[in-house]
Amino acid sequence: MINIRKTHPLMKIVNNAFIDLPAPSNISSWWNFGSLLGICLILQILTGLFLAMHYTPDTTTAFSSVTHICRDVNYGWIIRYMHANGASMFFICLFMHVGRGLYYGSYTFLETWNIGVILLFATMATAFMGYVLPWGQMSFWGATVITNLLSAIPYIGTNLVEWIWGGFSVDKATLTRFFAFHFIFPFIIAALAMVHLLFLHETGSNNPTGIPSDTDKIPFHPYYTIKDILGAILLILTLMLLVLFTPDLLGDPDNYTPANPLNTPPHIKPEWYFLFAYAILRSIPNKLGGVLALILSILVLVIMPLLHTSKQRSMMFRPISQCMFWILVADLLTLTWIGGQPVEHPYIIIGQLASIMYFLIILVMMPVASIIENNLLKW
């Protein structure tokens, strides 16, 4: 009798994606982040669903409903903090996943890569809208500042901002629509993630060497299911350490003050995972220029396949490119630090230099390093 998992219409899909999938025999722990992102997404949808049962999207009651969840709902505090810190874990995994793709040349799978960039944008939009929902000071002012950036668009900017706000300022209409979008977006992300996987399974996974591995494949189960379970345990352990010991470590104290349109916080800043982009935005004195730089800082990922000048796919055997990559990582960490600092003397110039370096490394230094390596190998 043929195994049901190979014949049943639904089981067959699961089987071909997670059980009998031929996988390269040498993929490292950097390939764990895809499954970890899936776990993060499921965790966020589940905790978010339970939070939505008790949350009220109204300017007068939003803040107190979050307080109510933490104080009165059974295990509400742990659900709330798992959701808030789960977002941080989600972005840590996302950055690692994208970094892995850049290092090992995974961007040559064009469809998979481009859907991945769309997924990154969708996740960032979802996280931003979620940050507005508790209706604290940083929620309100973050929403005001970031949505206001659209007013830099020539001609239609002001109308566009008022259309998004649903009025002349961030108010009840804004909060309600952000809640609606924040609820629906994770399901769109889940659907896109399936398409992401669909295209990945058309080509098969890349591997650290960047060399085709068709001659040396192993079944996904049990080898990589076990490996993924180890990753999942470490992810959940890290998340629960955050949640149970330092739940507010990555949050902003200002968000424990209810939103007040008459009182601006001294330093308006987004969550830590947006600080690198926020630093790039702030480092340009022109509003439209800043907005364009902000969008391009993420959109530059789309042109990575065009910037690939090396004859090798992976950076595994390319020491100069490796140096460039790690300089880029250091630069992103610098930008993240600057994004959280006030706009004053040493920080402004450091932010501007780091922003220039960011685009310079990606657009000039990495392609040039690849050409130098080609010539050194006489290719």
Swiss-Prot record:
Keyword Iron set for record: yes
Assigned keywords, A-Z: Electron transport, Heme, Iron, Membrane, Metal-binding, Mitochondrion, Mitochondrion inner membrane, Respiratory chain, Transmembrane, Transmembrane helix, Transport, Ubiquinone
Cofactor(s) required, per the database record: heme b
Co-factor binding details: Binds 2 heme b groups non-covalently.
Its membrane topology: Multi-pass membrane protein
GO CC, alphabetical: mitochondrial inner membrane; respiratory chain complex III
Gene Ontology biological-process annotations: mitochondrial electron transport, ubiquinol to cytochrome c
List of residues binding heme b b566: H97, H196
Residues bound to a ubiquinone: H201
Binding-site residues, heme b b562: H83, H182
Transmembrane segments: 33-53, 77-98, 113-133, 178-198, 226-246, 288-308, 320-340, 347-367
Record's subcellular location: Mitochondrion inner membrane
Gene3D superfamilies, sorted: Cytochrome Bc1 Complex, Chain C (1.20.810.10)
Assembly mode: The cytochrome bc1 complex contains 11 subunits: 3 respiratory subunits (MT-CYB, CYC1 and UQCRFS1), 2 core proteins (UQCRC1 and UQCRC2) and 6 low-molecular weight proteins (UQCRH/QCR6, UQCRB/QCR7, UQCRQ/QCR8, UQCR10/QCR9, UQCR11/QCR10 and a cleavage product of UQCRFS1). This cytochrome bc1 complex then forms a dimer.
Family, as annotated: Belongs to the cytochrome b family.
Comment field (misc): Heme 1 (or BL or b562) is low-potential and absorbs at about 562 nm, and heme 2 (or BH or b566) is high-potential and absorbs at about 566 nm.
Protein name listed in UniProt: Cytochrome b
Source organism of the structure: Ovis aries musimon
Record lineage: Eukaryota, Metazoa, Chordata, Craniata, Vertebrata
